[in-house]
C-alpha cells in the first residue's frame, strides 16, 4: 500500500500529475486546488500524501499536499453516492475547512454552488457528515504523527533526496554525490530544491 510519494514533479494535467521517482512515473489524481498549488513546481521535488485504491484491473493513486485534504477525501466517500471522482470535484471547489464550515452551519447554498451537487446529495452530505466533519483536523493530525519523523529535513535526508533527483535526470550516483556534498558543505541550510538547482547550474558551466 502506497501512503506517501516524494519525487520530481514531471508534469501536470487538469486532473492528475506525474511524479518521477528514480525514472518511474507515478500517475496521481488530485483535486483542482492541489494541482493549482503545484503548477509552478514542475521540475522540483514534491511530497504528497497518497490514498491507494486497488481494483481488479488497476491501481489508482490519489495525492494530497496535506493530510487534512486526504481525510476529507475519505470522509466524503463515506457518503452514499459519492465516489472518488465526486469527492475530488467537491475538494476542487471547497477546502476541507470550507467543507467543514458549510456542513457544520448547514450552509446548503455553498454546496449548491458546486456543479453536479444536487439537492438530494446535499441532504446526504448534511445528514451523514454532520457529526463527522468536526473531527477532520483531529484525524489528520493523529495520522500525520506516524510519518512526522520521515519528513524531517536532516542532513542525510536532504542529500539523499537531492541525489535521487539528479540520478533521475541521468547523472551518475558518484558524480551526484560528489557535487552535492561539495555544495552542501558550503551551504548547510540550503533546501533540496535549491541544492538540485545549484548542482545543475554548476554542472552546466
Swiss-Prot record:
Residues 66-144 are annotated as: Domain II. Residues 145-153 are annotated as: Flexible linker. GO terms for cellular component: cytoplasm; Holliday junction helicase complex; Holliday junction resolvase complex. It comes from the Bacteria. It holds the Pfam family HHH_5. GO terms for biological process: DNA recombination; DNA repair. One of its GO terms (molecular function) is ATP binding. Has three domains with a flexible linker between the domains II and III and assumes an 'L' shape. Domain III is highly mobile and contacts RuvB. Homotetramer. Forms an RuvA(8)-RuvB(12)-Holliday junction (HJ) complex. HJ DNA is sandwiched between 2 RuvA tetramers; dsDNA enters through RuvA and exits via RuvB. An RuvB hexamer assembles on each DNA strand where it exits the tetramer. Each RuvB hexamer is contacted by two RuvA subunits (via domain III) on 2 adjacent RuvB subunits; this complex drives branch migration. In the full resolvosome a probable DNA-RuvA(4)-RuvB(12)-RuvC(2) complex forms which resolves the HJ. HAMAP family: DNA_HJ_migration_RuvA. The RuvA-RuvB-RuvC complex processes Holliday junction (HJ) DNA during genetic recombination and DNA repair, while the RuvA-RuvB complex plays an important role in the rescue of blocked DNA replication forks via replication fork reversal (RFR). RuvA specifically binds to HJ cruciform DNA, conferring on it an open structure. The RuvB hexamer acts as an ATP-dependent pump, pulling dsDNA into and through the RuvAB complex. HJ branch migration allows RuvC to scan DNA until it finds its consensus sequence, where it cleaves and resolves the cruciform DNA. This is Holliday junction branch migration complex subunit RuvA. It comes from Orientia tsutsugamushi (strain Ikeda) (Rickettsia tsutsugamushi). The lineage of its organism: Bacteria, Pseudomonadati, Pseudomonadota, Alphaproteobacteria, Rickettsiales.
